[in-house]
Design a protein with these regions (language model features):
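Intrinsically disordered, low-complexity Pro/Gly/Ser/Thr-rich segments with frequent PxxP/GP/PP motifs
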Residues: 90-99, 178-203, 281-306
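Edge beta-strands of extracellular beta-sandwich domains
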Residues: 115-132, 218-227, 318-329
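Surface-exposed interaction/gating patches
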Residues: 143-163, 238-280, 341
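Conserved small/polar residues in nucleotide/adenosyl-binding loops
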Residues: 335-342
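Hydrophobic membrane-insertion alpha-helices, especially the h-region
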Residues: 25-42
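Extracytoplasmic low-complexity, Pro/Thr/Ser/Ala/Gly-rich segments
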Residues: 41-117, 252
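Terminal targeting segments of Actinobacterial cell-envelope proteins
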Residues: 1-22
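Short, aromatic- and glycine-rich surface loops/edge beta-strands on solvent-exposed regions
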Residues: 106-116, 207-214, 308-316
């Protein structure tokens, strides 16, 4: 990837893509915030993109962090007193919460015991002096990830189950669904990770959303966006009629919202900013029309007026949303919507 990835499309002066913070203090702080929020809401050849092997998991409350290209640390929390964490189901160890442990380039596993509430966690990876964060998620039969530049992005599909998975990929772009060869019947063996360069299907530089559906088995899906300074990894989310995106820090330089309509009819999406002075509708975001099977990009930089806010999206049918926010030079924060299972929709 190059410096034109992710954040460069949001603002020209910043040449660093991804969601990065310098220094261990920011990394640890972000991990703590991620855990608290989760508990509160209950062309690059494939061989050059190494992917860590993951081990099968058994039934239970288990979360998996997609493997990172850089050395990663796993941060986990729970309302209970302890969790099991590790790099495979055979190597889980009991630890008191909150817990931080090194997983390097392996997938990270978090598991709660019977009777405990759902655990939460994140993986923090370092590469080239930069730190990136990705939440740990549960395996599912499908999910969606959005990227700003598919030409420099990968899909990472993890089969953490004990049987093979077969997945289909569908990409939604600004002009509708992208149809090309090689997107159907992709087999992922048990305990394996498959890296799929998105540039094979779309070598453009406009936002797209990839829908991954497992015909057989369950998978964990992430998106890896490449840049000159390293990479950023995001985890899959689900479509919903109502989506809440985490707080946007005050005085950010850019805020760009990516919304996709996976349905078959045209939708109108309304956006509400939740601020300390009360909710308001950002200019130009009261009704965002999206054609079927397509993706739109909305610039909210001026509309948010530099306030620290959260965002609520509402539509008559399920939509997918992701927010790309850039703060001070060299910093890009990427927020995604929680899974609908954690929301009241």
């Amino acid at each position: 990837a190059s410096g034109e990835d992710s954040c460069d499309e949001l603002t020209e002066p910043d040449k660093k893509a991804g969601r990065y913070w310098k220094g261990p203090v920011w990394a640890v702080t972000l991990a703590i915030v991620a855990i608290a929020m989760s508990l509160a809401t209950s062309v690059i050849p494939p061989m050059q993109r190494s992917a860590a092997k993951v081990q099968p998991i058994s039934s239970g409350r288990t979360l998996v962090c997609p493997p990172s290209q850089g050395k990663a640390s796993l941060a986990a929390g729970s309302s209970g007193g302890s969790l099991q964490v590790g790099t495979s189901v055979e190597k889980l160890s009991e630890a008191s919460v909150p817990v931080m442990t090194n997983v390097d380039t392996s997938a990270g596993y978090i598991r709660s015991t019977a009777g405990q509430r759902r655990p939460s966690g994140s993986a923090l990876s370092s590469e080239g002096g930069m730190t990136a964060w990705v939440p740990c998620i549960g395996a599912a039969t499908g999910g969606a990830v959005s990227v700003t530049n598919p030409s420099t992005s990968d899909l990472v599909v993890v089969n953490s189950d004990i049987r093979a998975a077969t997945v289909d990929v569908t990409m939604l772009g600004p002009k509708g669904e992208i149809v090309t060869a090689g997107m159907r019947g992709i087999r992922v063996s048990p305990g394996q990770t498959k890296v799929l360069p998105m540039s094979v299907w779309d070598n453009g530089a406009t936002p797209v959303t990839a829908l991954v559906n497992a015909r057989e088995g369950r998978v964990v899906v992430g998106a890896r966006m490449w840049a000159g300074q390293g990479h950023d990894t995001s985890a899959m989310t689900q479509a919903a009629k109502t989506l809440f995106l985490p707080a946007v820090p005050a005085k950010v330089s850019t805020a760009t919202l990516i919304i996709s309509n996976p349905g078959t009819r045209r939708l109108s999406v309304s956006v509400t900013a939740l601020a300390g002075r009360g909710p308001f509708t950002p200019d130009g975001a009261d009704e965002i029309d999206i054609d079927p099977r397509s993706t739109v990009q909305v610039d909210l930089s001026k509309a948010l007026a530099g306030e620290g806010v959260g965002l609520r999206l509402s539509a008559d049918d399920p939509v997918i949303a992701r927010l790309f926010v850039q703060g001070k030079p060299g910093t890009c924060l990427l927020y995604t919507s929680p899974s609908p299972r954690d929301l009241s929709t």
